[in-house]
């Protein structure tokens, strides 16, 4: 991570943007070259900086350009939105739960249980599905109650209006 400096933050026009990226962007070199042609400058060699710079320049639609395996958390200080983004086929996991107005997320379920008040309560429906399909399961369903995963090819948008799920790839 020393090259990626995560979480990575950038300021632009008085707004703060932050990103955490778990994974690899296969077309990073091409994306970076395009951004450089458009006048962007980079201080690292990381995928993380390329994704953040592309987002700041183009907005959330930039994720459609990403080819790779990844889970991303991205804070947009200008719009006051948090995005949770998962790769097209769901190689990299990304789990979340809500407690009141707080959205808790992690790349592993055990990371959610480290948050006070998030308990590992068994979800009977999810458990039955695993025993019935095992070891496969439906995306979005799990063994633990109120623990969800961002679907492959989707992103979540979280702001003062709540949580919205969007598909960016099918």
Region locations from a protein language model:
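Cysteine-centered catalytic environments shared across enzyme families
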Residues: 1-170
């Amino acid at each position: 991570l020393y090259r990626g400096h995560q979480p990575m933050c950038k300021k632009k026009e008085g707004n703060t943007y932050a990103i955490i990226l778990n994974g690899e962007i296969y077309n990073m070199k091409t994306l970076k070259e395009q951004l450089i042609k458009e006048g962007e400058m980079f201080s690292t060699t990381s995928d993380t900086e390329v994704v953040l710079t592309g987002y700041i320049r183009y907005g959330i639609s930039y994720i459609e350009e990403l080819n790779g395996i990844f889970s991303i958390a991205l804070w947009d200080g200008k719009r006051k939105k948090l995005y949770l983004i998962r790769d097209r086929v769901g190689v990299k996991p990304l789990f979340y739960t809500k407690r009141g107005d707080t959205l808790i997320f992690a790349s592993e379920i055990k990371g959610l249980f480290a948050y006070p008040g998030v308990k590992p309560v068994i979800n009977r429906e999810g458990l039955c599905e695993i025993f019935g399909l095992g070891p496969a399961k439906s995306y979005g369903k799990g063994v633990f109650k109120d623990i969800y995963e961002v679907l492959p090819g989707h992103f979540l948008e979280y702001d003062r209006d709540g949580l919205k799920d969007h598909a960016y790839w099918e």
